[in-house]
Amino acid sequence: VTSLTRKIGLSLGADTCWPICFEEILGDLAPVVKVGKDEVRFEVERVRIAPFALHAKVDYDLVIDRLTYWYAPAREWIKKSILMDGTYTWNNPWSIESNQKHTAYAAMLALGLPIPETWMVPPKSYEPKADLQVTLGRYADMFDLGEIGKQVGHPSFMKPYDGGGWVGVTKLDDEAGLRDAYEKSGKSLMHVQKGVIPFDRFVRCVGLGPQTILMNYDPSAPLHQRYRTDKDFVSAEQRKHIEDITLTINAFFGWDFNSCEALLKDGTWWPIDFANPCPDSQVTSLHYHFPWLVKAKLRWALFTAATKRKMRMNLDWAPFFEVRERKLGPERRIEEYGRLARAHFDTERFEEFCARELAQLDEVAWQYFGSERAREAIRKKVEQLFPKHEVESFNEHFFQAIQAWRADDKAARAPRLTQHVLAPVAAATGASKPKSPAKKR
């Protein structure tokens, strides 16, 4: 038996609470997993930002990346690490850089998904460039924005073609609103998209590897209340349908971690925002759902690092378009896309790995999220976002939301806990890590 260590790097920006929880639960769990004849242990550290030589060896087996979409030095370091050292990374940095929401809309339209009528309009103004005026003078057509609004239909939305976090999104009820939003859009390249209004249901599905969580979503609520906690808000068939859509998008673009917003109207699910490869991961918005995300990150991180999952640098779209050409009905076609996506994420092998090697994770995480360490991790994020006089009340609010999750989680796991005798697990106060020497492969 060979003892190996896999090293996980966290490439972080403003993320505060989930990295703390990730690190501390991993320390409590102290997993030693079997991969073939090898025993694999894990280390985790936060990636520093510094000058680097292109030939310098990177010793991370996995990097969980939260910076690529906006911070170029981290993105270019990750690209080099993948190319030269085979580092597995969430998410594919080339795909994040090149595939914006605009491409995602076009791709899913090409696969036959119901995407609302969407137009791109040239920006209202431009950054000065040497050939700009010549180009516009020769080739740019005048257009009637009001006529575009009529073709799209109202109500509609104007939003950046590459945006996120609801930044720059304007609801348009009429032509006057459309023209006003365009005048204020500045140099941003914008979409005008038909609104799916009124809708019967608004959901957000997060996919992390082959794992998904579907949440009822209220976009009109304050940020810390948008994710609702009700459970039976869609049928089993609808849940599977949305999960298939989410995993299809993720596999198609090579994103391990992404979210999909979809609206139900008159029996049809309309994906409206699904190029979010750095999804919200903070307790201050996810609250009750936050422990699921931390556990999902741990499972997929340990699996991808332990098994040395290979990074796919090139996207393989052909199998999806081959399904499209089979002229299946809409529901059957999305089922087939979902099957391809689950194969992409090696779902069967992942589930076997979790059942065999990470059986204690649920209990260790349950213990941790009831601890003072978890409360303190929450506090650190609350202190970043809320006025000083509101810190105590909101810290307690989010901690109690997680205690509600713990109550539900314990009840859900009760049948398993009575049927199987759990091996001793590390206490919530911490656990000593194995001290046997380990070598890196």
Kindly label every feature range from the protein language model.
Residues 3-9:
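Extreme N-terminal starter segment of soluble prokaryotic enzymes
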Residues 12-135, 377-430:
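Conserved N-proximal alpha/beta basic substrate-recognition cap immediately N-terminal to
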Residues 60-64, 204-207, 268-281:
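A short beta-strand motif that forms the metal-chelation/ATP-contact edge
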Residues 68-69, 274-290:
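Glycine-rich phosphate/pyrophosphate-binding beta-alpha loops
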Residues 108-109, 116, 136-167, 187-198:
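ATP-grasp fold ATP-binding core
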Residues 162-253:
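Phosphate-binding site of ATP-dependent enzymes
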Residues 224-271, 295, 301, 305, ...:
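A long amphipathic alpha-helix within ATP-dependent nucleotide-binding catalytic cores
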Residues 306-441:
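Peripheral (often C-terminal) accessory segments that flank ATP-dependent C-N-forming ligase machineries
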